[in-house]
Amino acid sequence: MSQEAILEKVRSIVAEQLSVDAGEVKPESNFQNDLGADSLDTVELVMALEEAFDIEIPDESAEGILTVGDAVKYIEDKQA
């Protein structure tokens, strides 16, 4: 899956999970600061990404995923 395809899928999931417009979801968007996620939202978002991409994101890794771009990079690395 290309980086662009991953970004589009992540953007769609983030928009749905956080009830924000997909146009607001950019690679540099911080889940908490820019998109208004709280800690529970972040946990639910990680679970949604795990399911959508059929990967596991350990808690230690999830703590380092702060932006949409971080999520895309992590998923891209896992699928390589």
UniProtKB/Swiss-Prot annotation:
rRNA-binding keyword on record: no
Gene Ontology molecular function terms on file: acyl binding; acyl carrier activity
Compartments, record wording: Cytoplasm
Domain of life according to the entry: Bacteria
UniProt modification remark: 4'-phosphopantetheine is transferred from CoA to a specific serine of apo-ACP by AcpS. This modification is essential for activity because fatty acids are bound in thioester linkage to the sulfhydryl of the prosthetic group.
HAMAP family per record: Acyl_carrier (MF_01217)
Xref: PANTHER family: ACYL CARRIER PROTEIN, CARRIER DOMAIN-CONTAINING PROTEIN
Entry similarity comment: Belongs to the acyl carrier protein (ACP) family.
Protein name: Acyl carrier protein
